Each structure stands twice: as C-alpha cells, then as structure tokens.
Amino acid sequence: MDSSAKTLTEDKQVYRVEGFSCANCAGKFEKNVKQLAGVQDAKVNFGASKIDVYGNASVQELEKAGAFENLKVFPEKLANSSMQAVKEDTKAPKEEKIPFYKKHSTLLFATLLIAFGYLSHFVNGEDNLVTSMLFVGSIVIGGYSLFKVGFQNLIRFDFDMKTLMTVAVIGAAIIGEWAEASIVVVLFAISEALERFSMDRARQSIRSLMDIAPKEALVMRNGQEIMIHVDDIAVGDIMIVKPGEKIAMDGIIINGVSAVNQAAITGESVPVAKTVDDEVFAGTLNEEGLLEVKITKYVEDTTISKIIHLVEEAQGERAPAQAFVDKFAKYYTPIIMVIAALVAVVPPLFFGGSWDTWVYQGLAVLVVGCPCALVISTPISIVSAIGNAAKKGVLIKGGVYLEELGAIKAIAFDKTGTLTKGVPVVTDFKVLNDQVEEKELFSIITALEYRSQHPLASAIMKKAEQDNITYSDVRVEDFTSITGRGIQGNIDGTTYYIGSPRLFKELNVSDFSLEFENKVKVLQNQGKTAMIIGTDQTILGVIAVADEVRETSKNVIQKLHQLGIKQTIMLTGDNQGTAEAIGAHVGVSDIQSELMPQDKLDYIKKMKAEHGNVAMIGDGVNDAPALAASTVGIAMGGAGTDTAIETADIALMGDDLSKLPFAVRLSRKTLNIIKANITFAIGIKIIALLLVIPGWLTLWIAILSDMGATILVALNSLRLMRVKDK
C-alpha cells in the first residue's frame, strides 16, 4: 500500500446519517461533502445510512452539507452507544411509533385541500378565487420541502429530480393549471414516501441482525456470578449460559454439554451438539445444558459483529449495474431539461402551435423525466438480496460479487474440507487371521498408533473411543517410525507392523499374495488409504481410512448442474486414483489431481481464460491464492475462521455446501430483477414521452407514470427478501 492510501485510511471517519429520502439525495450529499475543505474523499453507503469521510470535517460542516435534506449526522460509535443506552434504560420511555397521520400530516392536509378544491371547482367553477386558493394552498403546504431544495438547485444550476419537479410545478402555475400543479406536488410526495418505506424495509434485515446477540452476559468474577454489559467483558472471562438463553459472546466451552441452535450465524436450522473445547458464537441459542464458556474475542470482534460490519460495507459497494445507473442519471436529467425546453418552444416558434398547449406538454416532459424509479432500481435490490443472504448464512461482501456470482460459467472445488469433511475416518477394518480377535487386534493397532505422529492416527483413536476399545493396558516397547512406510513396536515379545503394502512387500511376508494385493487396490481405488497390520511372518488384518465425503456434496453438484453450471471441477493434491473415486462419487464434471497450491492457481487462471467468469470454493486458508485469482472466491465455514470471512468475496457461514445453490439462485434473481427494473423504468418513460407527438401527454399521466414506475420497481426489488433456501 502506498503512503497516500495509508494516510487516507488512517483519516477515515464513519458517521451515521438520518434523513435520507432517496438515493439521489444520498449522492448529492456525498458530492457536497467531497467539496468541504479538509475532506480528501467521501463515500455514502445509502443502504446502511452511513458516510465514510476521509480527512477532517466537523459534524456541523457535514450537517451543513446535508442541509438541503435536513440531514442529521452522528459519529458511528457515539450513535451506536446512544442507541444502546436508550434500549437498555428501563426507566426511559419506549420510543413510540409515530402514527401515520402525524408522520405524513402535511401530505394528508395537502390532499384534503385538493379534494376541497375539486369540490369547489364543481360548485363554483374553475376560475373561482376560492377554488384557486385551495389548490395554491395544497401546492404550498405539500410542496414546501420540494421547493426548498428545488429553488436552491435552480440557483446553483444543479439539476436533479427535485429541480425538474419544481420547474414543472412553477410552469403549471404560471399557465394557470393550478389543479394539475397541486396533483403533481402531492403524487411526488407520495412517491418519495413510498421510496423511503421500501428502503427502510430493505434495511430492516440488517437491523434485525444487530438485535440477535444479547447485550449483557452472566460472568464469573471473584467467585461470584454477575451480570455484565458485553462492552465490559474481557478475553479470558468465564461466561455462564443457562438453557434457553442466547449466547452473548464468542468463546470456547470449558464445561458442559448442550445442543446449540446456530441458525443466526450459519443458517443451519438443526441444533449442533456442543461439548468441551467446542467453539460457540454470539447470537446463537443454547437449547439444553448449562455451559461455561471462556471468552475468546471482544464484542467488536465477534463473528456476528464482523458479519454486520461486512454486510453494511457490502451494501455500500456499488454494483456494476448501479454504477451504470449513476452514470446514466448524471447525463439523463440535463438531457430531459433540454428536450422539455425544445418541446415547449419549437412547435409554437416554427410550426404555429399554441404556446399554452406546448408549454404544458414541455412541463409534462419534465415530470416524466423524473428519474426516481431508475435511481432506486438497483440499491433496493442489492440491499434486499444481501440482507436476505446474511440471514440464510451466506455473507456476500458487495453488490459486485452478487452480480458476478450470477454470471459464473464454472465452479472449481477444493476437495479437502469442501467436498469432503476434511477429517479422516476409519471406513473399513477386516481381520484376516483366525489367531486374533477383532477387538484384540484393534486394541494393538490403537496402542501403536497412539505413539504415532501420522495424520491418520487420529481416525483410529476416534474409532477406538466410539467402540469403547481400551488400549492403555497394552504395553508397547521399542516403538519405531519407519519413514514413508509405517510404524513398528514390540508387544508381549512380538513385533507388530502397521504400514503400506510396500512395507510388507519389503518384509517378504509369506501370505502377501497377488490376490491380497488386488483387494488392497480395490480399497485404494475407492479413495481410501489402506494400511496393513501384521508381523514379519503373517498378515493379521487391513484397515482403511478416508477423508469422508460430505453428505450434501453430491446433491449440491446436481443442483448446480440443474442451474446450468455444467463445468464443476475438483482440485486436489491427492493421487489420481483417490481423486477419481471421490470425483465420481460426487459427480463433478472434471477432476484435477496431484496439484500443488501454485498448480491450483495456474489452473484457475486457465479456467478464466476458457470460461470467463469462474468461482472457486475452498476453506480460505491453504487455497487463498486460487480464491483470490478467481472471479468470485467463496470460503467455507466462515463462522469458524476469521480468515475465511476476511479473504473471500463470499463466505458460507455454515460448514457445508448446501447454501451454494441458494446463493447462485439469489444472485441470478437479483440480476434479473435489476435488469427488469432498469428496462421498465426507462421503457415507461419512453412510452410516456411518445405521447407528446399526438399531444396526449398530460401532467396527470406524467406523474402517475413516474409514481407507478417507482412503486412497481420498489415492490419488485423487495421480492428478493423472500427468496427461500430450498
């Protein structure tokens, strides 16, 4: 990182913003902040209602930059602590929900004046003073906030949607169209209110995440159990979690057994059995036993805190579609102003048209040109999709990755820990000699492997524990590790060997026949590591160990193929026989074996050259270079490792693949909805503008087309909150 970038990061200040009414206003606020002295850069996160300021600026300066919308700005830490203090102060009155009639009183009053205006119109006539005054009252009351911003924009020659509306209303009033001017004001206010409502609904998914973890925990201090706020809990403290309580902090169980519902973090609906040395996460539910948990992270570093932070950051990342809309809107509004002026002036000047008629048509063009629907077409979709994904245990770190995942043509899977569980288990055990019983032989194997450093020894120890096979009374002498071959040890005067077929070939064991060797090869061809137990005279048995394939892997690959992703490739460092056995079992379309980390990286680059958009899924640790090189890097088990959350573009918080097809479906649906929104928003404008040619465009049609498009686009985007994990 260069020094300027480093300085920029160090001077970053994050503020919460209250009062955003639309995405366009957020963009304008960002522009104003960037122009402040001492500010090097600024970035508004409309989805999270935040702004990142790089440089030095006071809260007063920031609020002045947002005065056009009466924005209120709070430093993030202060905002969070204030919100928390209000929540926890039991004496403080609960925040009352503002009734609809109070929240929108000016809008309701303006609508009432319109109703009375039309009543007066029918009774007293159109040109009656009372009728006109009622419509004027509706315009002034309903359009006060609109005009306040619109006039400021006109003075600065800053053309946005409020400028268009202000000019349209003033123009309509000048030519005496009081009724239609008041209708434009009220319908525009309704449109803005609906936009705010839609965005608040989309943001609610993140607010609900913030309330998942308790804010206090029962902690053991000086031999006493006391309730402490999570901000005051330190790493190393012992937390007591009773049955039915939510876990407040991340930690490791030091005492107790329970089933913990981790749906809030991983999306898994089935409770997970937890015992001593298992990790637990803040926000998860302890369903059964009493647990004593040693705290391993401060509150700001817990998994749920990182998820919330990264999801908010993700919502602020502009997706390619949003970048297109922002760029388009920048030129769109001035072009609409020019078209409206031409419509109003050209026909009367050059073709003898009526000034009243064509000025009216020009004003209608201004109203049609309001880009409300276009501006919200992408942000509501992105916020809804990312929030929904987070609730289902899929952490997507930006709109750009959401879009790219929907366009992938191939997915590469790291084998170990992704398609397989990453933990070796005993799959086969056969006694081949009548001189020894099965339990006795396994006891000998366990006693020898207990002294071994071989990675597969843990599988044998676990199997012995499950089958209650004791080995502590088996005395092993002269234990030796035979590098690359196996192990040996003396038990009751007999030397036993455990190792590869190669070891027993070298020992010239008499019953190592071709038939036996073929049986071993059958196990090896199934992707298992076969080990032989025997003496230098005879073979006593064979034991096979394998990295067990996940139950969900085959189904996930099938679902991806059904979604049209035909290229599913397994990358592994295993030998070809093992790789082919596992690959055939799960159903991947291609297998690449005996790969080093650099080979995986090179293969991903090759895939990108062939297929364009390529995703790579792994554990985010030893395959980090390949994840980084892919179009979209997806990490498994994000709940258990900070590395996975930090390095990947997308993290599956649960330690299984079942969320991957859901993530692909959600991203594709998001892409389709964004495209449909943009097409519809632009299409409805074009249709309305074409009504100018026969002179059919009215202010009524213009504002209704704009409001209708805004409502439909918002509702269409909110559908993404309801996409289910099938």
Swiss-Prot record:
The chain crosses the membrane at residues 105-125, 129-149, 163-179, 335-355, 363-383, 671-693, 698-720. It holds the Pfam family Hydrolase. The keyword Glycosyltransferase does not apply. Its EC number is 7.2.2.21. It comes from the Bacteria. GO terms for biological process: iron ion transport. It is found in: Cell membrane. It catalyses: Cd(2+)(in) + ATP + H2O = Cd(2+)(out) + ADP + phosphate + H(+). Its main location: membrane. The active site is at D414 (4-aspartylphosphate intermediate). Couples the hydrolysis of ATP with the export of cadmium. This is Probable cadmium-transporting ATPase. It comes from Staphylococcus aureus (strain MRSA252). The gene is cadA.
